[in-house]
Amino acid sequence: MKVLLIGGGAREHAIAMALKKNELVELYTLMKNKNPGIYAISDEVSFNSETDVPAIKEFAEKIKPELAVIGPEAPLGVGAADLLIEMGIPTVGPKKLPAQIETSKEFMRNLFKKYEIDGSLRYAAFNEYGNDLETFIDEMTSLGKDVVVKPAGLTGGKGVKVVGEQLKDNEEAKIYAKEVFDKSIGGGNIIIEEKLVGVEFTLHGFVDGENIVFMPAVQDHPHAYNNDEGPITGGMGSYSCPNHGLPFLSAEMLDRAEKIMEKTVSSINSEVGPYNGFLYGQFMLTADGPKIIEYNARFGDPEAMNLLPILKTDFLDVCFAIAEGKLDKINLEFENKATVCKYVVPNGYPIDPVRNKELTVDEKAIENADAILFYASINEKNGKLYITGSRSAAVVGISENIEEAEKIAQMAIENFKGEVYYRSDIGTLGLIKKRIERVKQLAK
């Protein structure tokens, strides 16, 4: 069974490992850098940019895969799924138009407005800097609301800036908005949104064009440093619970979040056609219930590393069901285990990361700790590993409870040597209790 995988990060390493649990799978990977984890379990690799559509076509024509799985968002934005589907290859990953749920924040917000989907918020879209933009921010200020400035297109998770975090106040938000236009960050268009106050969580679903089947809820930790301090990153780690919920998330709030995603899928279908792939909803649990921060048209990273290792159902079967519209025929099961994921990242990340420095990894010690190792933005050259400037590698601990899973992950994360750092508090009971208290305060 030949499977084409596009992408070379930790998320794709998790996807590759999940696919290879089926002994019939022959894995053919197209990726930019030599990710040693993916390389080791691939039958053949094509080293090309994941957005190089002609290279994707050439590789697919050569290997003739029976299934394709697209990992990152960038290939979706340039129509990689459209190409593969046109070639007659069952593909996991939405076509370019449905993928706008991630690639165009304006499309996403307008969809919520048009179809009256719950969980929306105040926003406005702008294609130039001017009085209208300033007036909207001033109106938000008069309402006592801070704002979030979001470039409308893809920025690798690093273009969004929030008042009270990266921005001092709404006046500084105007300055950053002008910078986005001047530098054409994320394509140059902008969404200004009200800042949500609450606790974040993520919810993933497998989507087959009509049906959505949910995975366990996960909490990501985007801040760079312990105690949720420092700049926003692509995610420093995450955890999930044995009951597939989260300690601060009631069954009612989880159900509301699921209904928001269900209506989103049907609305995408009505607006631009069926969505076949992974869908990741980033939510804020507020005093008014769950609100959607944004959607991703793929697995979250790091969340994929929490979810895929505890998937009991054959992932190959799930992927075919997604591509062929047959998820209603699949009995989706996850283990009732806790997971904790922790990332090591380059010193200076995400602002000014060191690059091309050697990273030493004691794989045997990580294995002895009963953790799972996932390589991310790593390039292997002449038998040595080099960091490339983004998140480097992650470890995952899995156990009967959060406390034990965190101990496993922490023991494993200490086996990296190089110019890297990590957050030691992810999955700790102290940090989780802070989330619980925060939600209690919101309810008052």
Curated annotation (Swiss-Prot):
InterPro entries tied to this protein: ATP-grasp, ATP_grasp_subdomain_1, PreATP-grasp_dom_sf, PRibGlycinamid_synth_ATP-grasp, PRibGlycinamide_synth, PRibGlycinamide_synth_C-dom, PRibGlycinamide_synth_C_sf, PRibGlycinamide_synth_CS
One of the GO BP terms on file: purine nucleobase biosynthetic process
Binding-site positions, Mg(2+) 2: E294, N296
Superkingdom of this protein's organism: Archaea
Pfam families, per the entry: GARS_A, GARS_C, GARS_N
Cofactor binding description: Binds 2 magnesium or manganese ions per subunit.
Keywords, alphabetical: ATP-binding, Ligase, Magnesium, Manganese, Metal-binding, Nucleotide-binding, Purine biosynthesis
Annotated positions binding ATP: 140-202
The EC number(s) this enzyme carries: 6.3.4.13
Gene3D superfamilies hit by this protein: 3.40.50.20, ATP-grasp fold, A domain, ATP-grasp fold, B domain, Phosphoribosylglycinamide synthetase, C-terminal domain
Catalytic activity of the protein: 5-phospho-beta-D-ribosylamine + glycine + ATP = N(1)-(5-phospho-beta-D-ribosyl)glycinamide + ADP + phosphate + H(+)
Binding site for Mn(2+) 2: E294, N296
Cofactor(s) for this UniProt protein: Mg(2+); Mn(2+)
GO-annotated molecular function: ATP binding; metal ion binding; phosphoribosylamine-glycine ligase activity
Membership in a protein family: Belongs to the GARS family.
PANTHER family: PHOSPHORIBOSYLAMINE--GLYCINE LIGASE, PHOSPHORIBOSYLAMINE--GLYCINE LIGASE, CHLOROPLASTIC
Name recorded for this polypeptide: Phosphoribosylamine--glycine ligase
Organism listed in the record: Methanococcus maripaludis (strain C5 / ATCC BAA-1333)
Designated gene of the protein: purD
